[in-house]
Amino acid sequence: MTSAHEIEFFFDCSSPWTYLAFHNIQPIAAALDARIRWRPFMVGGVFNTINPTVYASRQHSVPAKSAYAKKSLRDWARWSGVEITPHPLTVFPVNSVKVMRGCLVLDREGRLPAFARAAFEAYFRDDVDISQDDGVRKVCAVAGVDADALLAAIADRAVKDELRANTDELIARGGYGSPTIFVGGDDMYFGNDHLPLVQAALLRLRGH
C-alpha cells in the first residue's frame, strides 16, 4: 500500500519532460523524507493502446506551438540545471525498451537512479541512440554497470513481462503518458510542471 511517505513515479527514458521530472522530483522527495518508488514502463505501449492520436499530432503540429514547446523545454532545462542538446536528436522518438528493462533489473539492486540518469544524459545531452546495444553499453559504462550481464538479464521473459505489466497497470489507473506520478495511492499527477502540486499533495497528506 502506498503511504504518505511514498511517491510512485511512472517513467520512460524516451521523454525529455520526464528527464526534467526525474531530476526535479528527487530533491522534493528528499526534503520531505518521501520514498520514490520507481515504475519503469513503455510510453509507446500506452500511446498505442489509448492515445494513438499522439503520432498524428507529431506529423501535423502547429509550427508556432512546436517552436514554443522547444523554447519551453530549453527554459525548463535551464531552470532545472539540466543540459539538453540544442540540436535535433539523430533518433526521435527512440525505442527505449532495453534501458527500461535495464531499469527494472537494476531497481532490485538499488541502482536504478544512477542508470536512468546516465540513460537520460546519454540520449538528451549526448545524442546517443539508446535503442542499440552500443548505446546501452555507453550508459552502463557511465553508471558503473556490467554491460554484458545487463544485456543478458534484460532478455529474460520475466523482465519483459514486468515491463508490460507496469505499462498495463498505468493504463488501468488512468495514466496516458510519461511521467505520471501517484501520491497516496490514487492521486495522479502528470508532467514535470505539476511537481509543485505533488509536493503540496504530500504535505496535505501529512496534515500540513
Question: What do the PLM-derived regions correspond to, one by one?
Answer:
Residues 20-123, 201:
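Structural alpha/beta surface segment adjacent to cysteine/selenocysteine redox centers
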Residues 3-34, 39, 118-208:
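C-terminal cap of thioredoxin/glutaredoxin-like
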